[in-house]
Swiss-Prot record:
Domain of life: Bacteria
Full protein name: Formate--tetrahydrofolate ligase
InterPro entries: Formate_THF_ligase, Formate_THF_ligase_CS, P-loop_NTPase
Pathway linked to the protein: One-carbon metabolism; tetrahydrofolate interconversion
A GO MF label: ATP binding
Family that this chain belongs to: Belongs to the formate--tetrahydrofolate ligase family.
Enzyme class: ligase
GO biological process, one term: tetrahydrofolate interconversion
ATP-binding keyword on record: yes
Catalytic activity of the protein: (6S)-5,6,7,8-tetrahydrofolate + formate + ATP = (6R)-10-formyltetrahydrofolate + ADP + phosphate
Gene designation per UniProt: fhs
Binding site for ATP: 65-72
Length: 556
């Protein structure tokens, strides 16, 4: 079987100008980056704002194994299958971060015969959005340090600057650094650190902004530090939101590419779902809804993280809520949740499937709390057995959730036809009546309790000393009206990555709250989640190369 990159490189690409005609986009509406990538103009986005939105399908998953469960691949395959059965369809995905591409993932543009192309470009520098976000973020850091050096008119306490620098790489050695060393001309010495770009609030803002005006307003509202009197300092106090928006003026425009099957795809924005809100840009999703009859999008990691954040943070900023949710499950992940060791996942074990089903069942129950129709997609692997598949289908029938086998990795659009028909049926026969899990007026404690008890199945929320003080402080500043964004391990419902399945009788401990007032949410840090990842012992980068003619090797 060919590798993902071999499959991608074997597909003859069509000019992007031809691909986007399917959804009413003309060549004049595009800003081209070569023949196969483009950004959509503000003029076109504005011209479709009054169009009635089509159907929205959110793809999520059970708690994943370290290898992932093929959610992006399933999203792409489902979109292609919808196209194949005659539906006018668009895809709206996140763009990959170079850190994980070089680290453990090796690529994030789908897989097999369900990929977005050109995959090498998408996985590397693409249209430069990540670099623009990194530059805007670090420009703000430079402006803060310059303000300190030039007299500190705002009275910023250098010990209480909460704006770290960022880099789109996994580099654990930069988590904590000292800046300003050497001499007085090098600035004010202080503690600093680096996060990965996809954890940046600038990334979150870009993905939640509805236009340039909204982008600038959100940038102005970023909290960067506290004064000596402990009052917050905002970007608007530095008067640099215009400069930051200028750096991002092209990055905010959604990127257009194509799938192997020729479905038009927006690939734009890429916040992580374990340390950020995990969804592609509002601008891309909203525009896709107004151009196509069906839009397929995804939210990162399992439904306890990405889907919860999509429904509580992103959906209020969209023209409409999802009409259906697809939960991707794999038998290998269910067996792992059922207690099987990673080395034994290829062996048949129906008992472990039954035991691990508790994880999938809780995700189904959680999405039902939002009143949205659900379809379970079994992402098929060659090691799956008929007996295991039959058991899973029977278990899904017991909780009255439709389930379909999908083999889009191996068969592309053809492998997703049954799933596409099931999703259309769910949308047609059931009506979504979306409701949020909590209200804006609820306190931060109430919002966190709702997520922990209703979504995670936990017993209670515990607050560390720092978080306790921040709850009082944030309420005084009026930030308690914002939604919450949990920073938590993706592998478990709990904050313990080793606690698999559907655990209960556990508490979640919030160690720190981080204000993301520009993005419009409060991040709650749990466990030992890092906002700057490290590289594994054998990084994917060690298998990458480029040939003398410029052909990429080793991406997957």
């Amino acid at each position: 079987m060919k590798s993902d990159i071999e499959i991608a490189q074997s597909v003859p690409l069509k000019p992007i100008t031809e691909i986007v005609k399917k959804v009413g986009i003309d060549a004049d509406d595009l800003e081209l980056y070569g023949n196969y990538k483009a950004k959509l103009s503000f003029e076109k986005i504005k011209s479709v704002e009054d169009n009635k939105p089509g159907k929205l399908i959110l793809v999520t998953a059970i708690n994943p194994t370290p290898a992932g469960e093929g959610k992006s691949t399933m999203s792409i395959g489902l979109a292609d299958a919808l196209t194949k059965i005659g539906k006018k369809t668009m895809l709206a995905l996140r763009e990959p971060s170079l850190g994980p591409v070089m680290g453990i993932k090796g690529g994030a543009a789908g897989g097999g015969y369900a990929q977005v192309l050109p995959m090498e470009d998408i996985n590397l520098h693409f249209t430069g959005d990540m670099h623009a976000i990194t530059t805007a973020h670090n420009a703000l850091s430079a402006l803060i340090d310059n303000h300190l050096q030039q007299g500190n008119e705002l009275g910023i306490d250098p010990r209480r600057i909460i704006w770290k620098r960022v880099l789109d790489l996994n580099d654990r050695s930069l988590r904590q650094v000292i800046v300003g060393l050497g001499s007085p001309v090098n600035g004010v010495p202080r503690e600093d650190g680096f996060d990965i770009t996809v954890a940046s609030e600038v990334m979150a803002i870009l993905c939640l902004a509805t236009d340039l005006k909204d982008l600038k307003a959100r940038l102005a509202n970023i909290v960067i530090a506290y004064r000596y009197d402990k009052s917050p300092v905002y970007v608007r106090d530095l008067k640099v939101e215009g400069a930051l928006a200028l750096i991002l003026k092209d990055a905010i425009k959604p990127n257009l590419v194509q799938t192997i099957y020729g479905t038009p795809a927006f690939v734009h924005g890429g916040p992580f779902a374990n340390i950020a809100h995990g969804c592609n840009s509002v601008l891309a999703t909203s525009t896709a809804l107004r151009l196509a009859d069906y839009t397929v999008t995804e939210a990162g990691f399992g439904a306890d993280l990405g889907a919860e954040k999509f429904l509580n943070i992103k959906t209020p900023n969209l023209p409409k809520a999802p009409d259906a949710v697809v939960i991707v499950a794999t038998l290998r992940a269910l067996k792992m949740h059922g207690g099987v060791a990673k080395a034994d996942l290829t062996f048949e074990n129906t008992a472990a499937v039954r035991s691990g089903f508790a994880n999938l069942k809780r995700h189904v129950e959680n999405i039902r709390k939002f009143n949205i129709p659900i379809v379970v997609a079994i992402n098929e692997f060659v090691t799956d057995t008929k007996a295991e598949i039959q058991v899973l289908k029977e278990l899904c029938a017991e909780i009255a959730v439709p389930v379909e086998l999908a083999s889009v990795w191996a068969k592309g659009a053809d492998g997703g036809i049954a799933l596409a028909n099931a999703v259309v049926k769910a949308i047609t026969e059931e009506s979504a009546a979306y409701k949020r899990l909590y209200a804006d007026k609820d306190s931060l404690e109430e919002k966190l309790k709702a997520i922990v008890t209703e979504i995670y199945g936990g017993r209670a929320v515990q607050f560390g000393p720092k978080a306790k003080n921040q709850l009082k402080q944030f309420a005084q500043f009026g930030w308690d009206q914002l939604p919450v964004c949990m920073a938590k391990t993706q592998y478990s419902f709990s904050d313990d990555p080793s606690l698999l399945g559907a655990p209960d009788q556990f508490d979640i401990t919030i160690r720190e709250l981080v204000p993301k007032t520009g993005a419009g949410f409060i991040v709650a840090l749990t466990g030992d989640v890092m906002t700057m990842p490290g590289l594994p012992k054998i990084p994917a980068a060690m298998k990458m190369d480029v040939t003398e003619d410029g052909t990429a090797v080793g991406l997957f």
